[in-house]
Amino acid sequence: MSTFRRLLSHPQLPLITVLLAVGLTLPSLWNGLCFDDFLQRLILLGDNPVSENMPATPWNLFCFHKGNDDYTQKLIHETAFPWWMDGIRFRAYFFRPVSSLSHWVDYLLWPENPLVMHAQSLLWYALLVGLASLLYRRIMGVTWAAGLAALFYAVDDAHGFPAGWLANRNALLACVFGLVCLLAHHRWRQKAWNTGAVVAPLCLALSLLSGEAGLAISGYLLAYAIFLERTSLRARMTSLIPYVIVLFFWALVYMLLGCGIEGMAFYTDPVRETLPYLLKLFERFPVFILGQLAFPPVVYYTLRPAMMQWTGLLFCGLCVLIFLPVLRRDRIARFWATGMGISILPISAVWPHDRNLLFMGLGAMGLIACWFNHTAGIAWNKKTYLWRISMRTLMVLFIIIHGLLAPLTLPATSCILTRFYQKIETAAQALPSGPEYEDTRFITINAPNYLFYVHNIAHLRATQGQYTYLRSLTAGKTPLQVTRLSKNAIKLTAEGGTLIDINRGFHIYQHGTIYPGQVVKQSDVVIEVLEVCDGKPSSAVFHFSKPLDDSQYLWFHWNHDTYASFSFPQIGETVRLEGARFDW
């Protein structure tokens, strides 16, 4: 044990953690592009139909939709948006100019080399881990506990996604600038480094301009003032004024620009949808605690939300018993716990995923290390046998989860996008390509997911010079009955469900108010809703302006893991399609 402690307090440990983190995420260099990367490439390179029809610019890369209702209806009419979004208020506008700048550099210097783009992301991740290691030592001293926290943070498998996905680089930048802010604040308050009064708020601004996740560092600043400062209450609260000013002006600019989220199943805007956000915060708080401190990962919420919620609540109760003794005695532990808890507030606005845990993990690993330090310092021979067995079991579990399983899993999570890309590419290759299909409308009866298997495929093909008109009439895993009513019309009926399955987080496009008899008009089709179940259409008729077998149309359906050609039955006949399922 003494040897292990000496290693954790080694002067070169911060460098070791950086090398370890980079080494474990090195496979991500070959991830290539995936998901939003396709769209960002089209925007940054410009001179293509996709970028010309979007409000985003190279300097404002995350502006997808400014909330203009007429623009939304235009996109629905032109079938760029799915028909079930009719009547919805939609907005998707993130203000992240610093992150946009980092991507602009990629496409300015090495536009055809994704490997170098990923190398830039890994450099940011290396800087993040190094700063975290330095922060632990500044707060906890050059101790084995600080080293343990740094080690656990460096190999946290939750970091694989932001380290390996180019479009998620904004989280790395936000956390890097957030940590510099906290380090500068610490030096200002502890060493009377007055320059820190300028550097720290400036870094907070850079963190916020990198990504909304930067809000989380304000929780650590507040916790610092409450638990770590030893000045008067007035002096501690006064030290926070520069950050309040930065937050105020950032929020003002955010509001004036019209940034925010509306009408997206994946996000909940805390300002525009306050009550739904608070309900989701209550649901997701225990999920984040469970996924960050223990097991399974947060992403399992997508598969088993109820199980994760109830297990998370039970685990939160267990955490009170585990950490209460150290929280009572150690103000540093209280600092980490409070910062961790407050950092959950911004990420609860997003569908739970491990890629959002960079800030939360900072406090979580610090708290675990404080618990180890506190527990190791107790006179064990004076405790009961049950207590000793319980503590040993907990120590072993924490070491297995964060010291063994996490580093073993991190390489896989950092390059998991290659698996996603392969599945999207397989589906994309099932669609014919070539100049003869330039004006062809590719329509699929069903798709497992509209974002991944419609929009992302269209964007992928666009990056390859194939500007594909692709849409799906339904989305989800419900089996369908397809009835041909006439040479121009079909009726789709869901078997025991609805035509759109958007309850899961990966279905990002929310539905508007849908009712029986509703008519939605698109450029070449009129959709008439016949039946509704739970507010979503379960049966609808699609009246196309041209015959279904017109040469302008190519029809497909989802068959196992890819698209397959679809042939309509005779007029008056019905065929059955299995649900469009997909397995990541």
Predicted segment positions?
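C-terminal luminal/periplasmic domains and tails of membrane-associated envelope-modifying transferases
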Residues: T3-F4, A428-W584
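Polytopic membrane enzymes that build or remodel cell-surface glycoconjugates and lipids
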Residues: M1-L451, N456-L460, V525
